């Protein structure tokens, strides 16, 4: 039997450009990927979560027997959520869109579509990786400061070799 995990709380969090993931992830590839990623230095309070919605299931009954003879299932969405409590303008532009300099940020016009990979490292050393997440970010006042609540919804990678989600024990995330 493998190592028992709880995947409790968040210890580190990163995001980055989805084009950096070009093959099925391994611990070695993740180790190298993190070198290109942006680390989120502040997650406000206890806002980090990983949630999977319940699947929608439809059952079909045999009219003659009244018993289920087949079913159909649509899997629920997987989302990584967190609020950044302290950030710079570049981070705001990365996740909310728009243009940034060291001292200014300007909101983009129209609809903004942002995709990033997301990686969370839990307190019990489990890496959770979403290779392609649709990022929905906004401004929200939380505890008297304007934070950036982020919802990263897992979407199907464009590369068939890449899974929609990976988990790695930290013991395998190392250089070759």
Give the positions of each predicted feature.
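Basic, gly/Ser/Thr/Pro-rich low-complexity segments located predominantly at protein N termini
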Residues: 50, 71, 102-103, 157
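Solvent-exposed edge beta-strands and adjacent loop segments
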Residues: 2-87, 131-145
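Short secondary-structure boundary segments
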Residues: 20-40, 98-105, 160-168, 174-175
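Beta-strand secondary-structure signal
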Residues: 79-83, 117-119, 149-151
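Mixed-charge, glycine-accented linear interaction segment located at domain edges/termini
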Residues: 124-176
């Amino acid at each position: 039997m493998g190592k028992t995990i709880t995947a409790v709380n968040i210890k580190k969090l990163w995001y980055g450009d989805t084009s950096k993931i070009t093959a099925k992830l391994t611990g070695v590839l993740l180790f190298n990927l993190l070198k290109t990623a942006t680390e989120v230095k502040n997650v406000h309070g206890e806002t980090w979560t990983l949630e999977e919605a319940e699947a929608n299931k439809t059952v079909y009954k045999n009219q003659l027997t009244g018993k289920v003879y087949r079913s159909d299932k649509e899997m629920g969405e997987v989302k990584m959520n967190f609020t950044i409590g302290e950030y710079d303008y570049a981070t705001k532009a990365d996740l909310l869109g728009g243009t940034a300099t060291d001292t200014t940020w300007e909101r983009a016009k129209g609809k903004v579509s942002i995709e990033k990979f997301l990686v969370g490292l839990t307190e019990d050393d489990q890496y959770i990786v979403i290779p392609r997440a649709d990022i929905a970010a906004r401004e929200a006042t939380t505890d008297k400061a304007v934070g950036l609540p982020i919802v990263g919804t897992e979407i199907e990678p464009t590369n068939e070799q890449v899974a929609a989600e990976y988990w790695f024990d930290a013991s395998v995330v190392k250089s070759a």
